[in-house]
């Protein structure tokens, strides 16, 4: 009977060890959960960025205001009859 109890005890210890630290155990499960949370946050940020890009694309396709704004800001274009003034700060002069 003592051998049987000892065998069952050793089996229980081995099963608990395997459950906690073995392959696909609790520790692996927690590590994978943490990776999933990080990846979900990255995906949410990328989804938000994609939505902003789609909105900008739609605005460029449908409205001339967005095209005009980009031409003014990025290319420095002005309309006929307008005068462009560039204000130079103190840091830029030196």
Swiss-Prot record:
Stretches of the chain found on the membrane's Cytoplasmic side: 1-3
The regions listed as transmembrane in this protein's record are: 4-21
Q: Which organism is it from?
A: Vibrio cholerae serotype O1 (strain ATCC 39315 / El Tor Inaba N16961)
Q: What does this protein do?
A: Essential cell division protein. May link together the upstream cell division proteins, which are predominantly cytoplasmic, with the downstream cell division proteins, which are predominantly periplasmic.
Superkingdom, taxonomy of origin: Bacteria
Provide the alphabetized UniProt keywords.
Answer: Cell cycle, Cell division, Cell inner membrane, Cell membrane, Coiled coil, Membrane, Transmembrane, Transmembrane helix
User: Could you tell me where this protein is found in the cell?
Assistant: Cell inner membrane
The gene for this chain is ftsB
Q: Which GO terms describe its cellular component?
A: cell division site; cell septum; plasma membrane
Primary subcellular site in the record, as a coarse category: membrane
The identity of this protein, by name, is: Cell division protein FtsB
Give the GO biological process terms: FtsZ-dependent cytokinesis
Which spans of this chain does the record mark as coiled coil? 33-76
Q: How does it assemble?
A: Part of a complex composed of FtsB, FtsL and FtsQ.
User: What is the membrane topology here?
Assistant: Single-pass type II membrane protein
